Every structure is written in C-alpha cells, then in structure tokens.
C-alpha cells in the first residue's frame, strides 16, 4: 500500500522517538507528507491555577515538538508539526484519531511501551485506544 499522509504522535519518550524515526523512513520511502503531533493532556488538579497549568503543558508540548522537529530536519524529511488540542488524559487516543481524520492521514504511527498485566490495567494504553477507534491503519512501534 502506498501512503501519502503519515501522522506520528510523540510524547518525548524513547519509544516515541523510535516511532518518529520509523515514520520518517516510511515517509521518505513512500514520498509521503509527514505530520508530527503531540497531544497536550489536561492533568488539571483542583488546587492549581488552570490557566497557568495550560500554559505550562503547552510549553512542554512545544518543547517536545521542537526536539522531534530537529530529528526530522536532520533526516531531510518532508514534515510539519502540530500541537494538538488540550484534552483530558482519558481522551488522548480519541484526540489522536480525530487529528488523523481531520488531516486525512493514510497511516497513524505510534509508539507502545508493551506494558501488560497490572501496569497495563493501571496505566491503560493510548496505543490500544487508537487501534480500537481508528479507521485508518495503525503502525505500532514497540520499545526496545
């Protein structure tokens, strides 16, 4: 299958860097456009200043995107970056799928930590949520 629009989601982890590198290679091989996104999670706690928290989380997200941008730039990939909307932590996978639909992505690339058992139950899995919700093919990149 030939992909023209590949979207990769990053969170700054080593696993997301692996996903980015795989997405870059795929985009170059397929001569596809690459979109690198980071979804800003709403981790609002009742005792904190919400506006300040939003500003901090957006700045952190932009820093992650800037780091990923440098990796993509060094590879001479055709790419763009996008800081996706502020969403509750339980809805990150929904936001990723919505971003993919809005951008008309042919493929979503996402890293997975491969957790299982109790830690998977506690932490959940954004990747698993994306697989369940996406109508677009999803490529999972597992951490080494």
Residues of each region from the PLM?
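Structural beta-alpha unit
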Residues: 1, 70-108
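Small/aliphatic-rich secondary-structure junction motif
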Residues: 2-50, 71-81
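Hydrophobic alpha-helical membrane-association signature
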Residues: 19, 61-64, 126
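Aromatic/hydrophobic pocket-lining residues that form π-stacking "cages" and hydrophobic walls in ligand
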Residues: 23, 68, 96, 130
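Gly/Ser-rich helix-loop-strand patches that form or flank binding pockets
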Residues: 25, 101-144
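Residue-level recognition of beta-strand->loop/alpha-helix junctions
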Residues: 38, 83-85, 142
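Acidic, proline/glycine-rich short linear motifs
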Residues: 38-67, 91, 95-98
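Feature marks short, surface-exposed loop/turn motifs that line or immediately flank catalytic pockets
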Residues: 42-43, 87, 116
């Amino acid at each position: 299958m030939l992909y023209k629009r590949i979207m990769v989601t990053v969170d700054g982890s080593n696993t997301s860097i692996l996903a980015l590198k795989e997405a870059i290679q795929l985009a170059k091989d397929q001569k596809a456009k690459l979109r690198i996104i980071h979804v800003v999670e709403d981790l609002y706690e009742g005792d904190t200043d919400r506006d300040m928290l939003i500003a901090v989380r957006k700045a952190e997200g932009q820093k992650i995107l800037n780091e990923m941008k440098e990796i993509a730039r060094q590879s001479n990939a055709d790419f763009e970056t996008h800081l996706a909307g502020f969403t509750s932590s339980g809805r990150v996978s929904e936001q990723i799928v919505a971003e993919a639909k809005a951008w008309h992505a042919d493929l979503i690339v996402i890293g997975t930590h491969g957790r299982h058992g109790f830690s998977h139950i506690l932490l959940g899995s954004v990747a698993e949520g994306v697989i369940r919700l996406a109508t677009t093919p999803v490529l999972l990149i597992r951490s080494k």
